[in-house]
């Protein structure tokens, strides 16, 4: 009897082992794709987080606005719409290699909303070579055709370093855009002048014309009467 129980247990264990071996063979037939690059990246990310450090451009950009005569007490530069601002740059290269400066650009920012309301179109010019620790003078003309108010001007300078193109921003300035003075030759102003002159002429004719007629007629009759009496004898004058 004991032998029969042992035989049954042994047969059950043999079936479980055979089923387990069959399952293992089936799973071993499944191909597994292994990405060594991804694995190494995952391992690297687990050991030390990957952080991309921002590049810092070693350039010194200083500039003057040649129209600073329009600077008012609050520090703003007042400029009329339709005029231009001239930026005189002093660009210093503190990088470890020579660079070429080849374009201007920038943005116009509204002071109230801090939103970009206009872009300064990129203006390319012949590349200016600037060696290490050397400086170069650059001049930019910025036509002003903007909404009136207080705005920020953020200039950009485009630099090429060993084939790598960079856009470097300079410190912003604040400007106040005002309307241009109204010229006497402005068509709108001339039309207003003509309208006012016509209005004054019409009023003058209406007021002085009627008063002149009412005062002039009796004078004419009196003159005629006096002239006619001078030629009559005194006996006929009544």
From Swiss-Prot:
Residues 1-18 form the signal peptide. GO terms for cellular component: endoplasmic reticulum membrane. It comes from the Eukaryota. The gene is IRC22. This is Increased recombination centers protein 22. InterPro entries: TRAP_alpha (IPR005595). Residues 213-238 are cytoplasmic. Keywords: Endoplasmic reticulum, Membrane, Signal, Transmembrane, Transmembrane helix. Pfam families: TRAP_alpha. It is found in: Endoplasmic reticulum membrane. The chain crosses the membrane at residues 192-212. Belongs to the IRC22 family. It is a single-pass type I membrane protein. Residues 19-191 are lumenal. Is probably involved in a pathway contributing to genomic integrity. Residues 219-238 are annotated as: Disordered.
């Amino acid at each position: 009897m004991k032998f029969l129980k042992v035989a049954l247990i042994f047969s059950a264990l043999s079936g479980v082992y055979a089923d387990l071996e069959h399952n293992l063979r089936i799973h071993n037939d499944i191909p597994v794709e292994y990405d060594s690059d991804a694995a190494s990246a995952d391992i690297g990310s687990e050991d030390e987080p990957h952080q991309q450090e921002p590049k810092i451009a070693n350039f010194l950009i200083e500039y003057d606005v040649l129209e600073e005569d329009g600077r008012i007490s609050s520090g703003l530069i007042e400029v009329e719409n339709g005029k231009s601002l001239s930026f005189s740059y002093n660009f210093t290269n503190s990088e470890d290699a020579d660079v070429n400066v080849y374009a201007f650009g920038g943005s116009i920012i509204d002071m109230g909303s801090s939103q970009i309301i206009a872009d300064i179109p990129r203006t390319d010019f012949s590349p200016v070579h600037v060696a290490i620790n050397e400086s170069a003078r650059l001049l930019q003309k910025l036509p002003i055709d903007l909404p009136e108010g207080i705005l920020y001007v953020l200039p950009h300078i485009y630099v090429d370093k060993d084939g790598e193109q960079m856009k470097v921003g300079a410190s912003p300035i604040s400007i106040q855009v005002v309307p241009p003075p109204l010229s006497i030759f402005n068509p709108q102003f001339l039309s207003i002048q003509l309208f006012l002159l016509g209005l004054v002429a019409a009023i003058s004719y209406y007021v002085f014309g009627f008063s002149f007629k009412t005062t002039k007629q009796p004078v004419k009759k009196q003159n005629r009467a006096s002239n006619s009496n001078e030629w009559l004898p005194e006996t006929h004058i009544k």
